[in-house]
Every structure is written in structure tokens, then in C-alpha cells.
């Protein structure tokens, strides 16, 4: 007859009986009693029982099997069940790292540094905005403090100094221009005896032939204007007064404001500075011509 396969219950029962027989042959209880009697100074009234023969108590310490395990015989039968292991010794401790706020912020803001053209334009916009705010604080002198960096404060002071130099040189050359125009006009007015140097509503006065000294007045006026205005242009260009004093011109302020939206406008800033310099010289010439017209009007009223 063929043997019938064993059920799971029968297999467990046979395995349990085999394990108990091996423990009986190995005298595990006697070895355990010897170990406990050697390690303890006080003997109990009852003989200790093997851990394999007694049922585990729920309040037993989990470290006791770990202390006994080195004394167990190193001989192991391949058919024995594996030793019971504490789950605390098998499972590694899971460490949860606390998030570093500074590192997270640096990663977030650092991701925008090496960006594309849009990121660079945004960086230019913010840099221009901060530069204008710092320059405005330095010129007004109302919000400047010692806690700010030295570079923006130095730039604002340099800008204010250049504006002061620009106004100072304009005032000096204005005195020279007015003195030259007045001297030239009154010299010819006093030396010419007839009415050719005066303006009059009468027809006979305008019909008179001009005196030769009238041409010398125009010659001296043109010569003085060229010499004075050329000197003004050379001095201001050499000292870079108009190139550094950007806050003194409304057009340059408009270019700076527009460069925050369209950075390409900064390429035209040197051209705008040069045109502003030319316009300053031309406005001085117009002022001298208007002064001559006013003088002729006053003379005509006097006559």
C-alpha cells in the first residue's frame, strides 16, 4: 500500500515531538541550571526551568534571551528550527532627518541663478530697481545710514558732486558770456555816432546805410561765442561732468526707467549723454542771442 501524505497538523506534531526528544537527549535544562547557578549569588528555592519547557510570560524582559544565547551549545542540527530573534535587533532604526529650512531656501533661490534669458532680464530689472532706489536715497540724504554698503553711497556722492560741478561751471561761463556780450554791445553803441546801431520804427532810420563798425560787432560776437562755448565743452568733457551726472537730465532719467523694462535701451545712453551735452552748449548760444535782442529792444525804447 502506498503511504498517504501527512497533514499539516501531523507534521507539526511530529516536529514538536522530535524537538522535545532532542532537548531531552541534550539535557538543556541541566545546562541552563548550571549557568544560572554560576551567575547568581542567591539560589532560589525552586530549580529553574528551561525556556523551551516553560511558556513565555508577557512581562518577561526581552534582554534575557540575549544574555543566555552565548552559553547555548554551538552544535546545531540542520533539522532544528531557526532561533527566535528579537524584531528590535533585526529591523534597523529609522531615522527621520529634520528638514533644513536654510538649505531649502538656497535650493529654491539658487535654481533661478543659471536660468534663461527671461531670468536674466528679471535679474537686470531687479538690479536696476535697487540701483535707482539707492541712488535716490543717496541724493536726498534723508534715508541714508551707516548700515548700507559703501559702494552705492560712494556712487550717489560722486553723482551729486558731478551735478554740483556741472552747475558751477555753467554759472562761471554764464558770467563770462554776459560780460562779453555787454562789453561788445555797449562799446559799439557808444562809439557809433549815427543811428545805424539802433533799432527804430521810423523808416528813415532803417533806410540809412549801416556803419562799418556794425560788422565788427557781429564779428566780435561770433568770435567770443565760439571761444567761450568751445572752452566750456572741452572742460566739461575732460572732467566727464555730463557723463557722470545722470540725475541732472530728465531724458537720462527716462532712459534709466525704460531700461528696467527694456534693457536694450542702455546701449543708447552714451548717445543721449552726448546729445544732452550738445544741447547744453546750443542753449547757451541761444541765451546770448536773446540777450542781444533784449538789449536792442531797450535801446530802441530809450531812443
From Swiss-Prot:
Residues 1-168, 237-280 are cytoplasmic. Residues 31-48 have a biased composition (Polar residues). It holds the Pfam family GET2. It is found in: Endoplasmic reticulum membrane; Golgi apparatus membrane. One of its GO terms (biological process) is protein insertion into ER membrane. Residues 19-86 are annotated as: Disordered. It is a multi-pass membrane protein. GO terms for cellular component: endoplasmic reticulum membrane; GET complex; Golgi membrane. Signal peptide: none annotated. Keywords: Endoplasmic reticulum, ER-Golgi transport, Golgi apparatus, Membrane, Transmembrane, Transmembrane helix, Transport. Residues 190-216, 302-303 are lumenal. The chain crosses the membrane at residues 169-189, 217-236, 281-301. It comes from the Eukaryota. Belongs to the GET2 family. Required for the post-translational delivery of tail-anchored (TA) proteins to the endoplasmic reticulum. Together with GET1, acts as a membrane receptor for soluble GET3, which recognizes and selectively binds the transmembrane domain of TA proteins in the cytosol. The GET complex cooperates with the HDEL receptor ERD2 to mediate the ATP-dependent retrieval of resident ER proteins that contain a C-terminal H-D-E-L retention signal from the Golgi to the ER. Component of the Golgi to ER traffic (GET) complex, which is composed of GET1, GET2 and GET3. Within the complex, GET1 and GET2 form a heterotetramer which is stabilized by phosphatidylinositol binding and which binds to the GET3 homodimer. HAMAP family: Get2. This is Golgi to ER traffic protein 2. It comes from Debaryomyces hansenii (strain ATCC 36239 / CBS 767 / BCRC 21394 / JCM 1990 / NBRC 0083 / IGC 2968) (Yeast).
Amino acid at each position: 500500500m502506498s503511504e498517504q501524505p501527512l497533514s499539516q497538523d501531523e507534521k507539526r506534531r511530529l516536529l514538536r515531538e522530535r524537538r522535545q526528544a532532542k532537548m531531552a537527549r541534550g539535557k538543556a535544562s541541566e545546562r541552563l541550571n548550571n549557568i544560572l547557578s554560576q551567575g547568581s549569588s542567591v539560589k532560589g528555592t525552586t530549580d529553574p526551568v528551561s525556556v523551551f519547557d516553560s511558556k513565555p510570560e508577557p512581562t518577561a524582559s526581552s534582554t534575557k534571551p540575549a544574555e543566555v544565547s552565548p552559553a547555548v551549545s554551538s552544535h546545531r542540527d540542520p533539522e532544528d528550527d531557526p532561533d527566535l530573534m528579537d524584531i528590535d535587533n533585526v529591523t534597523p532604526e529609522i531615522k527621520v532627518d529634520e528638514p533644513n529650512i536654510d538649505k531649502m531656501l538656497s535650493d529654491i533661490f539658487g535654481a533661478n541663478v543659471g536660468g534663461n534669458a527671461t531670468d536674466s532680464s528679471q535679474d537686470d530689472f531687479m538690479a536696476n530697481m535697487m540701483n535707482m532706489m539707492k541712488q535716490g536715497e543717496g541724493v536726498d540724504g534723508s534715508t541714508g545710514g551707516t548700515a548700507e554698503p559703501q559702494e552705492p553711497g560712494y556712487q550717489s556722492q560722486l553723482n551729486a558732486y558731478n551735478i554740483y560741478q556741472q552747475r558751477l561751471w555753467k554759472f562761471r561761463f554764464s558770467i563770462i558770456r554776459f560780460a562779453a556780450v555787454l562789453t561788445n554791445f555797449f562799446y559799439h553803441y557808444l562809439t557809433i555816432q549815427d543811428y545805424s546801431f539802433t533799432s527804430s520804427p521810423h523808416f528813415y532810420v532803417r533806410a540809412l546805410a549801416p556803419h562799418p563798425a556794425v560788422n565788427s560787432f557781429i564779428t566780435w560776437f561770433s568770435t567770443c561765442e565760439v571761444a567761450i562755448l568751445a572752452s566750456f565743452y572741452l572742460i566739461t568733457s575732460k572732467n566727464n561732468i555730463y557723463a557722470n551726472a545722470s540725475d541732472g537730465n530728465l531724458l537720462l532719467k527716462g532712459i534709466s526707467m525704460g531700461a528696467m523694462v527694456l534693457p536694450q535701451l542702455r546701449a543708447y545712453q552714451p548717445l543721449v549723454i552726448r546729445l544732452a551735452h550738445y544741447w547744453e552748449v546750443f542753449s547757451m548760444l541761444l541765451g546770448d542771442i536773446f540777450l542781444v535782442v533784449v538789449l536792442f529792444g531797450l535801446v530802441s525804447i530809450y531812443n
